[in-house]
Amino acid sequence: MSSNTVAQFATELKMPANVLLEQLRAAGVDLKSVDDSVTDSDKAKLLDSLRRAHGATDGKKITLTRRQTSEIRQADATGRSRTIQVEVRKKRVFVKRDPAELAAEAAAEAKAAAEQAAAEAVDMQPESVEAQAPAPQSVEALAQAPVEAVKPVEAEAPKIETPPVETPAVEAVEAAAPKIEASEAPAEPVQTQTAQAVEETPAPAETPEPVPAVKAEAEPQSAQPAASREQSTAQPVEPEAKKESVAAPKTQEAGPESVVHAQTDLNSKTPAPVAKSETAPSAPKAAQGRPQVAEAARPPVVNDRAREDARRAAEAEAAALREMLNRPRKVLRAPEPEPAGTNNAALSGTLHKPAGKKDAAAAPAAAPKKEGGNKPAAAGAGGKKVIKTAEVSSTWNDDASRKKPADKAAAPGGNSRDGWRSGGKGGGKNSRNGRNQHQDRRNESAAQEFIAREIHVPETISVADLAHKMSVKAAEVIKQLMKLGQMVTINQVLDQETAMIVVEELGHVAIAAKLDDPEAFLDETPGVSEAEALPRAPVVTVMGHVDHGKTSLLDYIRRAKVAAGEAGGITQHIGAYHVETDRGSVTFLDTPGHEAFTAMRARGAKATDIVILVVAADDGVMPQTREAIHHAKAAGVPLVVAVNKIDKPEANPDRVKQELVAEQVVPEEYGGDVPFVPVSAKTGAGIDDLLENVLLQAEILELTAPVEAAAKGIVIEARLDKGRGPVATILVQSGTLKRGDVVLAGASFGRVRAMLDENGKQVQSAGPSIPVEIQGLTEVPAAGDELISLSDERRAREIALFRQGKFRDVKLARQQAAKLESMFDNMGEGTQTLPLIVKTDVQGSQEALVAALTKLSTDEVRVQVVHAAVGGISESDVNLAIASNAVVIGFNVRADQSAKKLADNNGIDLRYYNIIYDAVDEVKAAMSGMLAPEKREEIIGLVEVREVYTISRIGTVAGCMVLDGLVRRDSQVRLLRNNVVTWTGQLDSLRRFKDDVKEVKSGFDCGLTLRGNNDLQMGDQLEVFEIKEIARTL
């Protein structure tokens, strides 16, 4: 009993092995894997199972496919030979009819024979092809047994060159079959290769599928109604026919379709064979409806003269086709450029057809399509639809004709958009004249004269875009940059200066420009200049050294207790408060005094009208006090000095005045313009005088701002809130900000969803000098960004995206420059890095902490801030820490549960801090631990050589006395002779009497040997020392 494996059986059946295995298991065959063997009985079980499942008792159709592959070499216009792969697939389909159905059809045939006998007898005489049909002479009789007509045709199909039965006209029409089939079934890739083989080889290749269809076209037009009716009847049946073959499911895809076409086109003589032959699986239902179909499908009787005329016309056309195909072939020549008015509709799509025969070939090919009556053929004859070689997606001529208008447009100006990306859609194998066109373009560009252009260079531009602007290849730009000493890639971003140098080196005129800058629209904001300016409250910033009492002073003014709730008792954010006093309203900005918050204080000075400089009476002028004075002077803001803590016994206001005079801050009593007010934040003494001086300064300044206008302001602080998203504290400087307004802040934009005042209460609008907290921005803006209210959200988005791209390009250009500069600096150095990820609660704290930590870097250990952002510590931060081996620092933020678990599993160090001092100190300690320890020598003893012995096995042994300290066996020693160091090394052994000892103390004698040195003399001294490692600190 023969057997093979499931995998081999699947290969024979041309189907996946796992699908076959499932079918065998469903049939009841117990198989474990595709490597198990399959017996004939198992195959029989599978066949029975499939027959039951598909409702068929016998195989109805067998398809045989033979494939042949060959190559054709053809020279093109440039003289290069081109190899073309040609694949010919020959297919035969045999259909077995059901005996019961044949009997029913024979009965129906006999019934209809009497009515149609005379007409059919006349039609059968002129043509020898119809000798293949059965004996009965009626339409219904031919409809009953179309398989007998199909089988002989299929049998003769491989011998198309010399058919024994067909007339010459039919043979010629058969040779043209691939073109007709191309319009009927444009989705079969197999017939593409077949059609190419027909036209590219001297003898026509076998194409059995379209043969019956071609015979039908040689017939008169009288069969059009019946053919169209039967075609619509046969189409729904095709899927059932495809299910019938179990052995070769994939190879049958073209089979049923070819049979449908063959039988449909035979209906020019026999109206209804297709429905009956293709609906064999559903015979009972089909048998009921056949009498009606036969009645409806009867064609009218046509006179013999019309048939004879149509046959002669078809013979003439077929003869012309045969003559054209038998002509000797010529070598393909490049087509001459056609004038603008030439009609390209008649061009053939075949690669190897001679150029001179295109028009001649198109006319005979169009005539049979008109005769056939098909819609696709009619469309092709009308010139509206391009007839392609076969079912291919595009023809070569199609691509060439598509390319011609573009070439004409590009040729006169010479400024083709191809540039370095030349090689458009038509290139490659599918382009008939692609190589010729590229060669012509190269010759054209070489012949063109150089044109100096004015190139507008933006702030940043990539190498590719710069080359495109100058209409040169990107390689030219890269080459020029290499000459200038810069290695770049095609996508690298260049800064404006470098790009302008390259443009000028290449002979063009460089113009620094900002093309299409959307920020130019911001200057056109209407309503600001027209609105009436009204008096506004002053914005007062409180500045000074840390712990000098700034927040406590504000607390007393606001009747609040903020300082008590702050971590470490120090301010680490900018606080904005609006206070209503008896003399009017004042907006206060409280800035941090710690040295790390320099940028925050600078922002506070820019946004303010008046600065209150707080100096402690017991402490005097300190570094941050001087820095605050410089910020105020740089911003051109008037100062009011508040000398705080005057209630303390050690307070000395006069010393403070003297120190401030040294800093160019002269009090009014000394002839200056700066008011000095002694205050106490604890008792409240002098607070009223301070507010009076502040409001007096505000009156002198005459502060005004438009109210009924679009809002403008500044971002004081920004943070990422887990529940509310990006939140920004802003100070409105002019106009009125309302809930629902579209705002733009730096590179972020959005619609104001909610506004809160400093007490957390909802407000609907905010006028000038009012601080509010807004929600609704797309991302966290940078502190210090300008905020503008716009009427159009689309414009706000456009400007924000432009700023983001600009910021990204500038950042990339800076990074590239920094990499190149630091590459050589760090080369050869053993610099260690401490990678950190910093997450803070607000933008300002992040800035300050990153600046303070980066400042700790030394030549040996460098702090590398891998990532710094606002918001809680998330899983993505921990993943980044895992990848970069970094320590995560959370400043006033915490990690969520998933991030904690991930950090614990991967050993990532999470550090939380509330005070900036602690974070800086711990990072400094970690960096100290990374420093290489300092090595120091420590002398622990002195030994004198009293006797020298030479022992053959050991060498020179010194008998010594320990004069000072001690000597250890693993110590290092220096040999001193006449107080001059002659050798440095280690002890080899140390003994006292006959015993090995670890150490010998002062006053005892011992014997010792030196490792690698036997040059010992009496009176030499040995200095014993140890090297100790001492930890270094920053």
Swiss-Prot record:
Residues 304-315 have a biased composition (Basic and acidic residues). GTP binds at residues 544-551, 590-594, 644-647. Residues 590-593 are annotated as: G3. Residues 644-647 are annotated as: G4. Residues 118-140, 154-446 are annotated as: Disordered. Its main location: cytoplasm. Residues 162-178, 212-228 have a biased composition (Low complexity). Residues 535-702 form the tr-type G domain. Residues 569-573 are annotated as: G2. Residues 680-682 are annotated as: G5. SUPFAM superfamilies: Initiation factor IF2/eIF5b, domain 3 (SSF52156), P-loop containing nucleoside triphosphate hydrolases (SSF52540), Putative DNA-binding domain (SSF46955), Translation proteins (SSF50447). InterPro entries: DNA-bd_dom_put_sf, EF-G-like_DII, IF2_assoc_dom_bac, IF2_II, IF2_N, P-loop_NTPase, Small_GTP-bd, T_Tr_GTP-bd_dom. One of the essential components for the initiation of protein synthesis. Protects formylmethionyl-tRNA from spontaneous hydrolysis and promotes its binding to the 30S ribosomal subunits. Also involved in the hydrolysis of GTP during the formation of the 70S ribosomal complex. Belongs to the TRAFAC class translation factor GTPase superfamily. Classic translation factor GTPase family. IF-2 subfamily. This is Translation initiation factor IF-2. It comes from Bordetella avium (strain 197N). The gene is infB.
